[in-house]
């Protein structure tokens, strides 16, 4: 008896794709990057096939994302934001400190051994008068909750036939034949293959140049804390000798819970993730010199590897890199998934315009728009986050603190400068995108039917 041929598509599909079946775009990768890419392209009217790897389930507030207002508009337009099963918390103010002793508070439980001549800090946001609208710099969302919302949206698109999920992985891709080979020997013709996977598969190693990589030999200790005071929707970041510490507001009773992202030497981060919560709280209070009050650990902690990775080319023939396949940046500025959303929305725009003009998806001039814009944005973000991650622990630390202090005083005194800095933070744009129109989805606009 002949054994049945394994299906190419997952359970949601009703039929098996035959050899050389054609699809507009094939998306490969894992996690949220692959899902949002497929959803953006489906929203633009393209037939999409997706092979993604399941992401591990996470506790709701162990890991968070800081999404820009433009990112929220995009997710609302795709009807994803409305399905989040955990509320978000807005950031209305942000304070950055060059060291713990620069934090000014009357509730400090310890005294710093070094009193700064003047504190080095930089603030975003400003007090609003009565009746004025509060400006939101970013939205803190649960990574687990967003993952579930994306999965739900993806399943809906699979059910209505706009996206087909592949159960069999891709093992090869021929750009000249516009053909992807699956592990069961089945071929699929596609105009474009988009990869979002951080670790390049063998077929991508043939098509794309090696990425530039830097391992920080550090880990981000992440989890949820409860403070002894309300967070007031304030995000705080301190450049500690061990690495940057970020405390981000999350929804909670009394508005006292915050998400922690603490960059530490990898061995220490892994050790702290395994010890008693009270010891972690003690170490955190010690590192911050008691300036931020008392902490209680809520739930389990985890460690995320810290790496910098930037692809040399975002487009190689008919292979397009997006998300983690194109860039991995230090999380201190919270720009990782914002970069991915800007990638996916712009690529959907570029391919939509390509089709409107009657050009082939592999048209070099059109794809160059995506590559030039997105690589410049990622390169600038990578350079900025890498520089900040190392600046305050380098020989230039004192000079950096002085520069931050001067800038902070200038911003506090100059209303126009403060408004300009707030506007850029609020727009969700990098410097490279200033003057360029936002992609449709980030403007809150849908594609024409």
Language-model features and meaning:
Residues 5-11, 17-26, 30-92, 97, ...:
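Glycine-rich FAD cofactor-binding loop and adjacent beta-loop-alpha segment at the N-terminus
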Residues 4-11, 175-179, 300-309:
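Short gly/ser/thr-rich secondary-structure transition/capping motifs
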Residues 75, 187, 192-293, 298-301:
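Conserved FAD-binding catalytic core of PHBH/FMO-like flavoproteins
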Residues 271-354, 361-362:
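FAD/FMN-dependent oxidoreductases across multiple families
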Residues 50-51, 193, 322, 329:
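Generic enzyme active-site microenvironment
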Residues 9, 18-21, 84-207, 212-220:
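Conserved N-terminal helical subregion
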Residues 5-8, 349-449:
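C-terminal helical "tail/cap" subdomain of flavin- and related membrane-associated enzymes
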